[in-house]
Structures are given as C-alpha cells and as structure tokens.
Curated annotation (Swiss-Prot):
UniProt-recorded name of the protein: Thiazole synthase
Phylogenetic classification of the source organism: Bacteria, Pseudomonadati, Bacteroidota, Bacteroidia, Bacteroidales
Any one biological process term the GO annotation gives: thiamine diphosphate biosynthetic process
Native source species: Porphyromonas gingivalis (strain ATCC 33277 / DSM 20709 / CIP 103683 / JCM 12257 / NCTC 11834 / 2561)
Pfam family, one: ThiG
Catalytic reaction list: [ThiS sulfur-carrier protein]-C-terminal-Gly-aminoethanethioate + 2-iminoacetate + 1-deoxy-D-xylulose 5-phosphate = [ThiS sulfur-carrier protein]-C-terminal Gly-Gly + 2-[(2R,5Z)-2-carboxy-4-methylthiazol-5(2H)-ylidene]ethyl phosphate + 2 H2O + H(+)
Originating gene: thiG
Family: Belongs to the ThiG family.
Active site (UniProt): 99 (schiff-base intermediate with dxp)
Binding site for 1-deoxy-D-xylulose 5-phosphate: 160, 186-187, 208-209
Amino acid sequence: MEMLQIAGKTFESRLFVGTGKFASSDLMEAVVLASQSRMVTVALKRVEIGRGEEDDMISRIVRHPEITLLPNTSGVRSAKEAILAAELAREALQTNWLKLEVHPDPRYLLPDPIETLRATEELVRRGFIVLPYVQADPVLCKHLEEAGAATVMPLGAPIGSNRGLKTREMIRIIIEQSRVPVVIDAGIGAPSQAAEAMEMGADAVLVNTAIAVAEDPVSMATAFRLAVEAGRMAFEAKLGSVRSEAEASSPFTSFLNLK
C-alpha cells in the first residue's frame, strides 16, 4: 500500500489512536502496539509533568521511536486558549506537532469553526504542524488548508458517540477537494465504519472510544488495524461502479447451445 505523508513525514499506518478512557497505562500501551499505529494522540489536559500516571503514559509512547506523539488541545474553548496550550505542549513535550481541538460546548463537544480557523492561522505562523479537528464542512476545510493546516480532520459524528459516518456526503466532498490529507476523526464506532471511510478515499482515521470501551480493547485494536488496511487496499484497487440494474457475471451467450 501507498504510505501516508503528512508535512513531509512518512507513516506506515493509516490508523491513528487516542489514549483516553483506558483503565491503565499497561492496557493503553498494549492497544497501541496491537494497532501498529504510528500516530498516537494525548490530551494536554492530562499532561502534568511530574504527576505520575500521565507521565508514565507518555513515557510508554515515547519509548517507541517509530511512534509520533500528537498532543491535542481537547478542553480549550477559544483560539487564545489553544495557542497557550500549544506553546506549553511544545515546551513540555518537545514537539511542534499539534492536534487542534476547540470545542466550547461541553455537552456535544462540537468544534468551533471560527476559533479553530483563527488558531490555525496563528499556530502555523508560530511554526506548528497543525492537524485541526473540525465540522465536516468543505468550505471550512478549504480555508484551513489555505491557512497552512497539515491535514484536515472532519468528524464522522460527535466525539465518543460511536455512531459512524453520519457526515459521509460532506466527507466525500472534502476528500474530493482537499490537497492535504483527510483524517476522519470522531464518531467511528466499528471496524466496518473505519473500512468504509478508507474505501471513500480518506487518508487515515483516528479511533479512541470504540477501542477503549470494547470488552477486549487489544483485539479490537487489531480489528481496526485490519479494517483500515482492507479499506485502503480496496480504495487503491478501485472499487467497481454501483449499478441500478443487474449485470450477469457469467453471460448467457451460447448457453446450452447444443446440436
């Protein structure tokens, strides 16, 4: 399969995983390894250097040099807060990669498009590699691309809902128009949904809740890895066209033409 490229960096896996909701750092690490993900997100609100478990979680990730740690700004409510969080992350974690999340509504956690665009413009100016989480809005995604975002990350459904690709028609347009990688983020609840996103032409998917709340998270991580690989292979193989009428795979020409 073709490798994923983001901001000049190559990734062997098209499955990104989050680190929230796991019962322990041991389980989180086992999931990351089973997924074979090369991009792992961690919420900045959980990062307090010297605090113990969160530090342990981060150390579990960074001891695998093949994995890129992607801090995210989950919990911030404005561009100003996002920029402050980004600078703290760069200092604490020594990375300029950032998953930008700005969602002021604590109930639905939907991203604020205006503040996200403002934050992206300023963070790019400051030298960050910005991966913004956004509504599945094709116009907004083009503005973010023009502002210098390294990817766009439209939601499939609200965070943690496991409802799947409720925004699929808008995602199709975003994929068609985008000149930067499109990563489907939020709402994916089953491996089949991840495969569908990849078949549509998404460059990657990010999954957290669907793995973390599974009865067997490690096996679920493996299932998502295989689904993402299968979906991408199907996309690269070029799916057949959808028809409204039947077309025989074995034509009846000369069938039982006996003399």
